[in-house]
Every structure is written in C-alpha cells, then in structure tokens.
Amino acid sequence: MSASEHDPYDDFDRQRRVAEAPKTAGLPGTEGQYRSDFARDRARVLHSAALRRLADKTQVVGPREGDTPRTRLTHSLEVAQIGRGMAIGLGCDLDLVELAGLAHDIGHPPYGHNGERALDEVAASHGGFEGNAQNFRILTSLEPKVVDAQGLSAGLNLTRASLDAVTKYPWMRGDGLGSQRRKFGFYDDDRESAVWVRQGAPPERACLEAQVMDWADDVAYSVHDVEDGVVSERIDLRVLAAEEDAAALARLGEREFSRVSADELMAAARRLSRLPVVAAVGKYDATLSASVALKRLTSELVGRFASAAIATTRAAAGPGPLVRFRADLQVPDLVRAEVAVLKILALQFIMSDPRHLETQARQRERIHRVAHRLYSGAPQTLDPVYAAAFNTAADDAARLRVVVDQIASYTEGRLERIDADQLGVSRNALD
C-alpha cells in the first residue's frame, strides 16, 4: 500500500527485514490484525528486557539516590510522552514517535554517559563505543525476539520506519561528514542492517520522527535535570536573575555550546527569569506550595519548548501529516538558547560538583576492571549468549565487541556485584 493523506506511511516504511510466520496460539475465531505495525513495534520495545534494565541505570544521579529517583527508564518514559504530544501536532504516527522515545537510550551502559566514556576507552582500538550505535545494535541483533533463516538473531525485527525513528545520527564512525563528529549511529559491524534501514533516505539526514525524539530528549533532560537539582537544593533558579551569576553561566555555555553565543544565553536567562512560573519557585523549601510551583514550572517549560517547535515547523511546512522526510523539525534559536541555559545550570551545579566527579572516576575504574576480568577469562566469564558469540567471533576486535556488549547490558547493581566479587569486598565499600 502506498502512502496517502489517510495513511502517510507506505509498505516500504512498514517492511521488516525478516519475514515472520503468523501467530499460532490464538483461540479459534480470534485471528486478526488489530494493531498497526508501528503499534506492534512499540509493544516489542516496551516488553524488552533491555528497556527494563534502564530502571537501574543512571540518568544524572544514581538510581538509588533519593526517594524519587530519575533513571534512564523514567527519562525514556518522559521523552516518549513529550514526543507523542509533538507527534499529535505534526501528524506523525503516535506509536512510532513514542517508540523512538522509549528506545532512544536503550543502549546506554551502566552510569549513563560516564559509562559510555569508559566503554569507549575500553574499545578505543576496535571501533569504540557510542550509546546511539548500541541502541541500533540492541534493536537489530542483541535483544532476542526473531531469528533469520540462518538462525542468526534479527533482534526485535522492527519495521524500517521504526528503526529509522530511533536513529539520531544516521552515519557510521568515520563515514563522510560523520568522520568529523564525535557521535555516530552505527558500528561498522552493523553496516548491513544500517544500509537496509537507510535505503532511499537522504544521506546523513534524520527522519522527522527521529528529529522529534531528539528534541523531546533535549526538552526532557534539560527541564527535569533542573527540577531534580532544585529538589536536591543544588540549583537555585534565582541565579538566572542575578546579572553576575547569569553572565558566568553564559560564558560557560558559550564554551560548551559553540553554536550559541554568550549574548544569546544572557538574553535567554533574562527571559526565563521573568517568567512568572520561574519566579514563583524562588527558594525551594519542599513545602506543598513550593512543590506545586515547581511542578507547574516543569509542565509549562515542557509545553513552551515543545509547542514552539510544533508551531515553527507547521509555519514552514504547511498543513497535512508531516512524516519521514516531508519536513524537518524547526526550533526557534531563542528556544534552543533557553534549553541551553537549563543544561548549563545542571552542568554547573550538579555535574561539575567535585563529589560527583569523584564518583564518576570510580565508576570508570570499575568498568575497566570488569572489562579486563571478562575478557581475560572469556568465554567462561560470559553469559551463555555472549559466550557463544565470543567463541564464533572472527578476530580480537569481534571478541572485544562481545565483551563490551555484555557490559553495556549490565544494570549498575549487577556490575557492582561482579566487581565486588572480584575484589572480595562488600558492595558498600565500592560506593
């Protein structure tokens, strides 16, 4: 079926790489396809073990810190919800965008971006590690659901459009323009699957659904990281109205976000400080009124940033369903600057805290220790699926990739138990 105004996606978008046999366990008279292909894909991600493991993986602070932790899983749920709301305004398939939000961090290792850094060091001589490329690897091979005619895993066997919607960086390390970028979306090992997904797509251009997911991710973590910082009393939003403090934040932001000038960031800080919902938070004291004010702040900022992208994109692209490569997401520069200010607040007052940096250093050391132990003792030190892959790996690079895949799959609790067993100490001694 070709695309139409009623259904802007076509059979090419809905194609799966491996043909699947019909289900056989249904009761007589109940056969039928009641869900769309993208709804089925969303369900596959939602029920995956890889998604559940995100409950014990760090977003900014550890999943066991505080009474209301934000984990990679809760963050992914928030991204999915924001993306779904944007999809309504743009005419994208709701299940497709929600799926992209759920899966956008599914390849994250223990300790989030800090764990990414450590695994990239471990695999530096053999293709490195990148969370976005690991997302794709999990969805197309590591998460068990479907096997091909040769008995090889096809991962969740998602549709082409679903896999593309999860792909923020549609290039491989060292390919074309991607060679000048730190982030990439595919490992060379997964080139064949990547070529299949990107067949007919404009080179190095993410589809609209992936762009929506990417902006929803930016909005979610910038707003919610600041919310967590306020609750933990690490961030005081009154700094936005203090010229000297705001100027220092703007200078830091100019260094971190080279595409946004200090003047733009100062102007953004002033705009944010003058919003009634920001002023209402004031000095947070955890009372009912303060908690309500903070929740209203997060709600209104998410709405501000998401609706600006919808309206600007609609103004540029016109009416009708906007899907795949029919449009690019348009976000006003002043809104990007406001989101950048929130990111700088989290960077300055949470991620640059000396205690946080010390914890991160210990986490990286732990990953290096466990990687050395697993590789030197493989295949006996590996889980059965990974041990089999290690035994059939063609060379040292492929064997190291298997070890990295296993570590990336660990929850933080499991990684710490393995490290504690190796050192012969209690887990508490490692904190």
From Swiss-Prot:
From the UniProt entry, list the residue stretches annotated as the region Disordered.
1-36
What family does the Swiss-Prot or TrEMBL record give for this protein? Belongs to the dGTPase family. Type 2 subfamily.
| Name of protein | Deoxyguanosinetriphosphate triphosphohydrolase-like protein
The HD domain is annotated at: 72-222
An annotated GO cellular component of this protein is:
plasma membrane
User: Highest lineage ranks of the organism?
Assistant: Bacteria, Bacillati, Actinomycetota, Actinomycetes, Mycobacteriales
Could you tell me which CDD domains the record lists for this protein? HDc
Q: Which UniProt keywords apply?
A: Acetylation, Hydrolase
Q: Check the record and name the Pfam families matching this protein.
A: HD, HD_assoc
Which is one GO molecular function term here? Answer: dGTPase activity
N-acetylserine-modified residues are where? 2
> Which SUPFAM superfamilies does the annotation name?
HD-domain/PDEase-like
UniProt keyword Hydrolase, yes or no: yes
- Ligase: is it a keyword of this entry? no
- Chain intervals with Basic and acidic residues compositional bias: 1-20
Q: Name one GO biological process term.
A: dGTP catabolic process
Xref: InterPro entries: dGTPase, dGTPase-like, dNTPase_2, HD/PDEase_dom, HD_domain, PHydrolase_assoc_dom
